[in-house]
Amino acid sequence: MAITRLGRKDFEKLLEFRVTLRRFQRWSEDQARMAGLTHVQHQLLVAIKGHRGDVPPTVGDLAGYLLLRPHSAVELVDRAQDAGLVERTPDGEDGRVTRVRLTAEGDRIMQELTQSHLERLHELAAVLDELVNSSGGTAPDR
């Protein structure tokens, strides 16, 4: 792959992209706080609710999603369980495995937060599309 000399517009786009992401992250953290969650608890609930498959995730699954060490994920799940947001349940097929699922309260909070996040992401999609597809930069198309 040949290296292309990047122009000023490329760096301006990159900066705008990073600022846009950071603003979304800050907004998301504020939304979580207003819902009574820490931003890390919100990420945990997203990981549980967004887990693919027919069974809830394990703590190991959650550690992978959140890029945490397993013992850190255990502590996070402990705190969320103490807050009434999640519950642990034994796996139906392997008694050594514990799964984590949302409580009714955790699910209610996730429904509210996800609705506002999806609305915000639709707004950001147009901004990001413009950044990626606008002319003036020198970076090659993919």
Indicate residue ranges for each PLM-predicted region:
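Short, hydrophobic-biased segments on the C-terminal half of alpha helices
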Residues: 59, 77-78
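Short, charged, intrinsically disordered terminal tails
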Residues: 54, 132-142
